[in-house]
């Protein structure tokens, strides 16, 4: 999750979730669409604001091989977003440290994807991406099911590659 006061990523232990699941709520709290979620006197938003792909955390935790599921097709480049500019303007007074992450969110995302591509080229990662664009706020159940089916079929087609990558043999 993103600590709204610090404007930095904060990793929490999911095993210590309270009964109201505020930690889970924070992981979905997109600035401007949802209020910051208070946990132990601190306010949090979705972690993707500061760290869109948690590959560096996985490496810091000692992992050397990664299966990464991206939510955008291969050709996608995140552009500067007017909604992030508006969110930065509105949140500036209450959470001034959120301004920079919001205004540079597209750069963070594109850099993380580039790094994942490098890991894949070095044989340290397998990347899975949708074969066609999916709306990030999709509500249509049929379209969501189609997206799920696409991912499942992609995994089945690449199962031999996945097993080899993980060192599993038949």
Where do the language-model regions lie?
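Patatin-like phospholipase
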Residues: 1-170
């Amino acid at each position: 999750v993103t600590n709204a006061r610090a404007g930095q990523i904060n990793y929490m232990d999911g095993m210590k979730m309270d009964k109201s699941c505020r930690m889970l709520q924070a992981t979905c709290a997109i600035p401007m669409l949802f209020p910051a979620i208070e946990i132990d006197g601190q306010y949090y938003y979705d972690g993707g604001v500061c760290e869109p792909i948690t590959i560096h955390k996985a490496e810091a935790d000692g992992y050397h091989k990664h299966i990464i599921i991206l939510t955008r097709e291969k050709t996608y480049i995140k552009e500067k977003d007017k909604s992030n500019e508006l969110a930065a303007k509105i949140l500036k007074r209450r959470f001034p440290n959120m301004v920079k992450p919001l205004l540079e969110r597209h750069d963070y995302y594109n850099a993380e994807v580039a790094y994942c591509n490098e890991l894949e080229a070095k044989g340290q990662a397998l990347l899975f991406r949708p074969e066609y664009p999916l709306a990030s706020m999709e509500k249509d159940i049929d379209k969501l099911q189609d997206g799920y089916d696409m991912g499942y079929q992609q995994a089945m087609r690449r199962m031999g590659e996945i097993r080899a990558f993980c060192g599993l043999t038949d």
